[in-house]
């Protein structure tokens, strides 16, 4: 089915907005090593990928209806396996995934886990809203920031200040870090 000579490292294979802003093609060896040890990519087709895992192009969304065994969809098919593949001894997960993918993990969290969702928003009228394209850009940029700074302590993520975003401590909690984009 797959020829290994046609596989591309996952972190270089995806072309979505988040991956464009992550800009892995200009990473140095140290950033690739950091990502290999810390980043996990949720894939509807492959499950959990490390950045250097080889993939072949595909188009499959997590919400796709499938008939695999007793599973009616990919959420049922993957079940707890995705969670077990991302949790490590630190019990810390920094969630930069979309809601479609993060719910694959959230369902299986335990009280021992520290799960921090990163929220990117901006003021629209009198309330903060998430704008999809800008949030995707910021997710990629944040992965880049984390890798460039070799972040090991989640609190260091609060220093992220790219694309006009800054940390809002007044809106954040231990489980949710909120970053607001200031529109000029």
What kind of feature is each model-predicted range?
Residues 12-26:
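Residues forming anionic-ligand binding surfaces in small-molecule and nucleic-acid pockets
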Residues 22-173, 178-184:
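Internal, well-folded beta-alpha domain core
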């Amino acid at each position: 089915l797959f020829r290994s000579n046609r596989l591309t490292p996952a972190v270089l294979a995806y072309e979505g907005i988040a991956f464009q802003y992550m800009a892995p093609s200009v990473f140095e060896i140290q950033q690739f090593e950091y990502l290999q040890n810390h980043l996990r990519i949720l894939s509807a087709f492959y499950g959990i990928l490390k950045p250097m895992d080889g993939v072949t192009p595909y188009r499959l969304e997590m919400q796709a209806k499938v008939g695999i065994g007793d599973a009616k969809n990919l959420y049922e098919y993957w079940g707890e396996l995705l969670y077990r593949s991302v949790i490590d001894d630190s019990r810390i997960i920094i969630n930069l995934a979309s809601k479609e993918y993060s719910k694959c993990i959230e369902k299986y969290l335990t009280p021992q886990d520290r799960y921090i969702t990163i929220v990117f928003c901006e003021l629209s009228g009198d309330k903060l809203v998430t704008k999809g394209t800008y949030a995707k850009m910021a997710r990629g940029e944040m992965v880049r920031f984390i890798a460039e700074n070799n972040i090991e302590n989640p609190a260091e993520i609060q220093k992220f200040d790219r694309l006009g975003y800054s940390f809002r401590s007044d809106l954040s909690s231990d489980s949710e870090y909120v970053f607001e984009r200031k529109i000029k």
